[in-house]
Amino acid sequence: MVSIIIPILNEEKGIRRIQENLKTLEGEFEVIFSDGGSTDRTLERIDPDFRVVHSPRGRGIQMNTGAKEAQGDVLFFVHSDVLLKKDVLLQIPDKIKRGEAAGCLKIVFDSSHILMRICGFMSNLRVKLRRIVFADQGILIQKKLFEKMGGMPQMPLMED
């Protein structure tokens, strides 16, 4: 099973969009929203089909908190503004069987603006050439490996 972990903080305006997207996914998965102390109506807007865990503020800390609660053997960290293709989870078991312990998705921005398209191209090129990944691209990692490496750094920026 895949555990989708989403760190959130004051996301009331966009939280419904990702929940609707998550409901379209195929495969066996759980969703864990790791809240860093939202003060708006984010938590009220989370569907009861999804789990919420409470964490100190900080994306790395929130990701670690979600991972500790995860039931899956694969962790999939995404940001709350990411939209996933409905069959994305079906591809993960084959990659794990081939020995890939971690990975990411190709990023595509929902914008026709040239700068956003360049940003997406450069992000994907960075992954291909340098093996540097950000959670905007979705971070996939076997739970055992995540625990062995001690989780995400607990720093305010660039933890992922």
Feature names for model-found ranges:
Residues M1-S3, E30:
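Cell-envelope/extracellular polymer assembly enzymes that use nucleotide-activated donors
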Residues I5, N10-T24:
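Short, well-formed alpha-helical segments that are part of the catalytic scaffolds
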Residues D35-L43, V82-L83:
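A conserved acidic beta->alpha catalytic loop
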Residues H54-A70:
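Glycine-rich, basic loop-to-helix element that forms the pyrophosphate-binding segment
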Residues Q71-G72, D136-M149:
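Conserved nucleotide-sugar donor-binding
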Residues L75:
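Short aromatic/hydrophobic "clamp" motif used to bind/position activated sugar donors
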Residues D87-L115:
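Conserved donor NDP-sugar-binding/catalytic core segment of glycosyltransferases
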Residues L157-D160:
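Acidic donor-binding loop at a coil-to-helix junction in glycosyltransferase catalytic cores
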